[in-house]
Amino acid sequence: MTWSETFLTVLKNNDIKLVTYVPDNVLTPLIKGAADDPYFKSVVATREDEALGIVAGAWMAGLHGIVLMQTSGFAVVPNALASLIVPSQIPAILVVSERGTLGEFNIGQVLVSRVMRPTLDALAVAHHTLTDDATMPFIVDRSIKQAVATQSPVVLILSPLLTGGKVFTEKM
């Protein structure tokens, strides 16, 4: 199984049915896999904080969901975490495809990558970086269970070591 197929299986095992996302190349296998599987309800959002609001509303209605985004999209999320998700005790699951590392060319991605983890720490939001197929299912499963049990959000950061990252072409 590919990393994305394994990830979707873990979501099913944890009753996660709603997949909200802002389109991203690295996340395409997850997005397409969820869209092609009748178990999941996929909803495209225009912004990451909008996707988080959709997941929050779904949680209040009894439906469990996740938000898929890339690193730069995380920049709009801290206010939604601090003003809605954390105080309302919503166990939102955020999945971030990591850019800004390992040869990144886009300074915007680099800057957000540098502040993402310190921002999550400042908000007391749990986060885990997924780097390999062997540990990924365990970390995802336990992170979802902990988020639900503690009514707290969790951020799962998908390292390029797991996903292969975005392929860059060198310009000469």
Q: Where in the sequence are the language-model features?
A:
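Thiamine diphosphate
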Residues: 1-172
